[in-house]
């Protein structure tokens, strides 16, 4: 299946790049500034974001459209995310440099400021692979081709050791195969009825050095919008890479995460939301060095998110409160974080 996927992507790229004349496009710059005051239990900090998008688009003489974007949204001033998307009658082909995430973990879409831990969290939630962690090539089916609003996307990353911000003529980094040599990511979405969005994704990394378990993940979501109310649910599962010969005193580790919530637009200016993320880390039992079997262990991290956003003029005032039990999958560890923000787009 992986060979077929790679062959199709190569064929599509070859056919798309068979052109001679390019119609000049226009360059635009968009962005925004967000000022924040974040407070933890024992800390406090101020910050101002650095977010600029450079965009250009045009059309080839063959009728193929193109769209280029590069972003400056890192702490430094280097381009860290870049994409080139070519639009054809048979779908879009894209070259993504640290872009084009296909994970469905935040598809449930509940959050006045942003979905759950995607906006703020006191600890990392192990949802699994997302292809935008790597430089990749993608194919997207055209809109309206399939019934029920169904769309499909596939992405392939040929080198998992490659770096973000790669420029033209980059030969890539030497592949260490620490968690895999290459990765493939699939995603489908549909809108079967008005207000309902559903979708799922699956990702796998192959060719890891001395591989015992592949790194793979899967997820699914559903979101329903009716009037001012949005409700959503998502589930993701993740199996990290594990090499052969790993210490046999610890079993295989896996993660399963449920995210759900509700959002209410009080009026055209004010939106409030509440959501939860429950992530379980499982360690399987294993036959130890003394021929005795260790016990299987489960640890559950629970996050609660309360958010509000108020739009006034061209600015958005926001507050996001994140309360976590068993922070970092550590039993008994509790953490809390509050972020006040002012965002202005330009």
Predicted regions and their residues:
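Outer-membrane beta-barrel proteins
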Residues: 2-346
């Amino acid at each position: 299946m992986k060979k077929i996927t790679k062959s199709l992507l190569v064929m599509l790229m070859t056919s798309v790049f068979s052109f001679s004349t390019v119609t000049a496009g226009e360059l635009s710059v968009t962005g925004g500034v967000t000022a924040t005051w974040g407070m933890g239990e024992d800390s406090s900090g101020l910050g101002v974001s650095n977010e600029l998008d450079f965009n250009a688009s045009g059309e080839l003489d063959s009728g193929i459209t193109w769209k280029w974007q590069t972003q400056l949204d890192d702490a430094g001033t280097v381009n860290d995310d870049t994409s080139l998307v070519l639009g054809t009658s048979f779908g879009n082909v894209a070259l993504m440099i640290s872009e084009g995430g296909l994970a469905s973990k935040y598809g449930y879409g509940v959050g006045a400021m942003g979905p759950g831990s995607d906006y703020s969290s006191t600890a990392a939630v192990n949802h699994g692979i997302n292809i935008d962690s790597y430089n990749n090539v993608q194919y997207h089916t055209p809109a309206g081709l399939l019934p029920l609003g169904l769309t499909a996307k596939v992405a392939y990353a040929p080198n998992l050791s490659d770096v973000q911000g790669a420029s033209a003529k980059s030969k890539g980094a030497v592949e260490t195969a620490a968690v895999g040599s290459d990765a493939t990511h699939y995603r489908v979405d549909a809108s079967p009825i008005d207000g309902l969005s559903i979708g799922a994704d699956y990702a796998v990394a192959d060719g890891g050095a001395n591989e015992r378990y592949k790194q793979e993940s899967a997820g699914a979501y559903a979101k329903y919008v009716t009037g001012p109310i949005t409700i959503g649910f998502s589930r993701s599962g993740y199996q990290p890479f594990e090499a052969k010969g790993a210490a046999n005193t610890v079993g295989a580790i896996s993660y399963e995460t449920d995210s759900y919530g509700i959002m209410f637009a009080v009026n055209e200016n004010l939106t409030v939301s509440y959501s939860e993320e429950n992530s379980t880390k499982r360690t399987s039992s294993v036959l130890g060095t003394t021929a005795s079997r260790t016990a299987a262990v489960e640890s559950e991290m629970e996050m609660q998110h309360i958010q509000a956003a108020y739009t006034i003029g061209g600015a958005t005032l926001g507050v996001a409160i994140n309360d976590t039990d068993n922070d970092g999958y550590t039993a008994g560890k509790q953490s809390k974080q509050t972020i006040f923000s002012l965002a202005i787009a330009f």
